[in-house]
Swiss-Prot record:
It is linked to Mucopolysaccharidosis-plus syndrome: A form of mucopolysaccharidosis, a group of lysosomal storage diseases characterized by defective degradation of glycosaminoglycans, resulting in their excessive accumulation and secretion. The diseases are progressive and often display a wide spectrum of clinical severity. MPSPS is an autosomal recessive form characterized by coarse facial features, dysostosis multiplex, hepatosplenomegaly, respiratory difficulties, intellectual disability, developmental delay, pyramidal signs, severe chronic anemia, renal involvement and cardiac defects. It comes from Homo sapiens (Human). It is found in: Cytoplasmic vesicle; Late endosome membrane; Lysosome membrane; Early endosome. Core component of at least two putative endosomal tethering complexes, the homotypic fusion and vacuole protein sorting (HOPS) complex and the class C core vacuole/endosome tethering (CORVET) complex. Their common core is composed of the class C Vps proteins VPS11, VPS16, VPS18 and VPS33A, which in HOPS further associates with VPS39 and VPS41 and in CORVET with VPS8 and TGFBRAP1. Interacts with RAB5C. Interacts with UVRAG, STX17, MON1A and MON1B. Interacts with VIPAS39; however, this interaction is debated. Associates with adaptor protein complex 3 (AP-3) and clathrin. Interacts with PLEKHM1. This is Vacuolar protein sorting-associated protein 33A. SUPFAM superfamilies: Sec1/munc18-like (SM) proteins.
Length: 596
């Protein structure tokens, strides 16, 4: 059991156990010793549902990364390829299988497609003459992976680009399938709300799948009351801004991958007296970040400016607890102290780690450049000087700062102005291409197609109306003891989360005008429940809403939703699902065309 998945109103361990069971069943079909050949991208997500110990129990003796040419030598009966359905991976698999055949003792080959089998891929294997070599060709529907007690992700890195640039609906189909799996485990979700073109398509697919699913009527009492499907392009602004929560900043600066972060090792080296700092570790410090760690659960969603005081308070509590040993006089007292020692030592280690991380972040956030960048972002979001060329952006280009940093700022300005005046847009494009290279013209084209960097049409800026109606900018933010979701960006309230908040109370009818300005349709559907499964809510019992971000979600948005879940009179608790956990940098990166 993973305890951090079962603390919320919805026990996500049920989902984790279901996908683990499916994995065990597949491994047992391949009787005998096994080697797994991994599509490298899958190792992180798989690590969240099955550690090596589980694989070992089912006779997995070796694991390799999928690479061209020959497979490394392994004295096993079965070789299983775990791969995404990508054509380029089929070519590598064929190379592996063909070179293996020529090498002597025959082995059994199997292939597990994650999350779906693909006719195109199987045809490619057939064309390459190896399809017949596979005894088992199956799919493993790992659509939604539980990351935390209230968080699920498909970890589909290309979903936004596929949906909004390429018109490819594969990830939407996987999202609908994932929702079907959830409903099989947690009951039918009676009410569906949505905003955006992709949201509409996912709802349609899911309703169609439900109609076609002629199996026995789902008799599980519904855990979720509502499903809210939200397109990322309804709120393009939020991921572009710098997140200011503790977890958000860790992700902005170091990048969190599948719950792990890699950090500079020197901050974590034990300080020894008089060794002058020699023999410092050179390998990055890798830490897992989730709510299984008490301290992290407490500080992850706080504004970074509120983290220091929590850490110093914790330090006093921990040192006071260690001092207690001097007061232990009787055998019973000493035994009690010793029994608490492992927990205290873990708490001290956790505090040391997070103090080091906070120092690393502070080095960045107290720099002059961070302050200048944040000032410009906040001016844009509050509607100041969004319609002319910005001096700071000009300076960044002139000094050849990171291209992604420049693109995030230019896109933010464009979104906060409902597009840029043509001459401002042309100027930025020209400066970017001259400084960073003309090969980036394809990237600029992608950003325009995605609606991130575009000319203002009809000469009208709708952002001020949206900002005022949805109260997206709050001047008096309390970062220490927040009263509003805007604390996650020190003033800006994420548009996506404000939509969720308003849906919960007083309902979207109050903001019809703004919903019409934002892209895509908004809709409501009901899924009928069999008699006897209708929920009678107890007085004071909160509704549970599953909010699904199609195209990605940031840690700051997750923090804002957790804040709403914890409000005394909030009325709604949120479970968050997404196609990908992302930040502005990884988002822009996914839209960049790699120069040839």
């Amino acid at each position: 059991m993973a305890a951090h998945l079962s603390y919320g109103r919805v026990n996500l361990n049920v989902l984790r156990e279901a996908v683990r069971r499916e994995l065990r069943e597949f491994l047992d079909k391949c009787a005998g010793s096994k080697a797994i050949v991994w599509d490298e991208y899958l190792t992180g997500p798989f690590g969240l549902i099955a550690q090596y110990s589980l694989l070992k129990e089912h006779e997995v003796e070796k694991m390799f990364t999928l690479k061209g040419n020959r497979l490394p030598a392994a004295d096993v009966k079965n070789i299983i390829f775990f791969v995404r359905p990508r054509l380029e991976l089929m070519d590598i698999i064929a190379e592996n299988v063909l070179s293996e055949d020529r090498r002597g003792p025959t082995r059994d080959f199997h292939i597990l497609f994650v999350p779906r089998r693909s006719l195109l891929c199987e045809q490619r294997l057939k064309d390459l003459g190896v399809l017949g070599s596979f005894i088992h060709r199956e799919e493993y529907s790992l659509d939604l992976i539980p990351f935390d007690g209230d968080l699920l992700s498909m970890e589909s890195e290309g979903a936004f680009k596929e949906c909004y640039l390429e018109g490819d609906q594969t990830s939407l189909y996987h999202a609908a399938k994932g929702l079907m799996t959830l409903q099989a485990l947690y009951g039918t979700i009676p009410q569906i709300f949505g905003k955006g073109e992709c949201a509409r398509q996912v709802a349609n697919m899911m309703i169609r799948m439900k109609r076609e699913f002629t199996g026995s009527q789902n008799s599980i009492f519904p855990v979720f009351d509502n499903l809210l499907l939200l397109d990322r392009n309804v709120d393009l602004l939020t991921p572009l801004a710098t997140q200011l929560t503790y977890e958000g900043l860790i992700d902005e600066i170091y990048g969190i991958q599948n719950s792990y972060v890699k950090l500079p090792p020197e901050k974590f080296a034990p300080k020894k007296q008089g060794d002058g700092g020699k023999d410092l570790p050179t390998e990055a410090k890798k830490l897992q970040l989730n709510s299984a760690e008490e301290l992290y659960a407490e500080i992850r969603d706080k504004n970074f400016n509120a983290v220091g005081s929590v850490l110093s308070k914790k330090a006093k509590i921990i040192s006071a607890a260690f001092e207690e040993r001097h007061n232990a006089k009787t055998v019973g007292e000493i035994k009690q102290f010793v029994s608490q020692l492992p927990h205290m030592q873990a708490a001290r280690g956790s505090l040391a780690n997070h103090t080091s991380i906070a120092e690393l972040i502070k080095d960045v956030t107290t720099s002059e450049d961070f302050f200048d960048k944040l000032t410009v972002e906040q001016e844009f979001m509050s509607g100041i000087d969004t319609d002319k060329v910005n001096n700071y952006i000009e300076d960044c280009i002139a000094q050849k700062h990171s291209l992604i940093k420049v693109l995030r700022l230019v896109c933010l300005q464009s979104v906060c102005n409902s597009g840029l005046k043509q001459k401002v847009l042309d100027y930025y494009k020209r400066e970017i291409l001259q400084t960073y290279g003309y090969e980036h013209i394809l990237t600029l084209h992608n950003l325009e197609k995605a609606g991130l960097l575009k000319p203002q049409t009809g000469g009208r800026n709708n952002y001020p109306t949206i900002r005022k109606t949805l109260r997206l900018w709050m001047d008096d933010v309390n970062e220490q003891n927040p009263t509003d979701i805007s604390y996650v960006y020190s003033g800006y309230a994420p548009l996506s989360v404000r939509l969720a908040q308003l849906l919960s109370r007083p309902g979207w009818r109050s903001i019809e005008e703004v919903l019409r300005i934002l892209p895509g349709p908004h809709f409501e559907e009901r899924q009928p429940l069999p008699t006897g499964l209708q929920k009678k809510r107890q007085p004071g019992e909160n509704r549970v809403t599953l909010i699904f971000f199609l195209g990605g979600v940031t840690f700051a948005e997750i923090a804002a939703l957790r804040f709403l879940s914890q409000l005394e009179d909030g009325g709604t608790e949120y479970v968050i699902a997404t196609t990908k956990l992302m930040n502005g940098t990884s988002w822009i990166e996914a839209l960049m065309e790699k120069p040839f």
